[in-house]
Amino acid sequence: MVADHQLLNMIKKFIFTITFCLFTQVSFAASDDSGSDSSNPQKDAQNFVKRGKKLESKGKNEKALKLYNKAYEKLLEANKADSRNPDILNYLGFTLRKAGKYEQAEKYYLQGLEIKPDHNGINEYLGELYVKTQRMDLAKERLAVLKDCNCEEYKELAEVINNN
């Protein structure tokens, strides 16, 4: 009788545990797929950009653009809180450039360079924008800024310039 009672309690605990696990899994599955689980819009945006770059490298440009647009929305939020952050301005420029909004992108890049003229990412991406908009002289100026950095940004911009 005592053994039956213990067995019954063990079965109840087992069922409770299984039920709890199932409900937990369902609630995670039902959460939105925004890719955002933090209250840090800059980090969220960086994650969207990273995922977008992976998709773009696989030729999935439309899906990548959707992620870049999500990143842009998060970056606007981050920029309201910290409008003098050159990294945020760089990512704003990047997402707009990827969307083909070159004038807007250039404005953000230039704002970032006012704050940090030697920002490697901004100099590279602004150079790429200049190549895309047929302003090779300005692209080469950005490359000259990166010349002594011994960084990937220099190599990547040099490659873009040489291929055009």
Show the residue positions of the predicted features:
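Residue-level recognition of tetratricopeptide repeat
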Residues: 85, 119, 151-154
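Structural marker of alpha-solenoid helical repeat scaffolds
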Residues: 81, 115, 146-149
